């Protein structure tokens, strides 16, 4: 497992809380969400892309934390904080950083589950 991206302890805690049989089901949903985020964030441009980045960053704060995706969670928190302070710009690096982390995190989970 890529410990730089995925927090094994949080995944084990989640498994203990909800049952190990439920983790693959919820993880599949989370992976699907990441695929959707990647696709939509890539397709949108300008202010629509920025608005979507704000939306997914807010959503990812909790879902990434629940699944032990610590780097993704940290980035989502930072972007959400900037969004609330109106400090995000259309040509900012946040979108490319979020896309890169979504890809890295999704791929790390897929290789972990295979």
UniProtKB/Swiss-Prot annotation:
Source organism superkingdom: Bacteria
GO biological process: phosphorelay signal transduction system
PROSITE patterns found in the cross-reference section: HPT
Modified residues (Phosphohistidine): 58
GO molecular function, one term: protein kinase activity
SUPFAM superfamilies: Histidine-containing phosphotransfer domain, HPT domain
Pfam families: Hpt
Keywords per UniProt: Phosphoprotein, Two-component regulatory system
HPt domain boundaries: 19-114
SUBUNIT field: Monomer.
Function summary: Phosphorelay protein which receives sensory signals from LuxN and LuxP and transmits them to LuxO, at low cell density. LuxN and LuxP transfer a phosphoryl group to LuxU on His-58 and this phosphoryl group is further transferred to LuxO. At high cell density, as LuxU could function to establish an equilibrium between the aspartyl-phosphate of LuxN and the aspartyl-phosphate of LuxO, LuxU transfers phosphate from LuxO to LuxN (and probably LuxP) and finally phosphate is drained from the system.
NCBIfam families per record: Phrelay_LuxU_Vib
Protein name as it appears in the record: Phosphorelay protein LuxU
Species: Vibrio harveyi
Gene: luxU
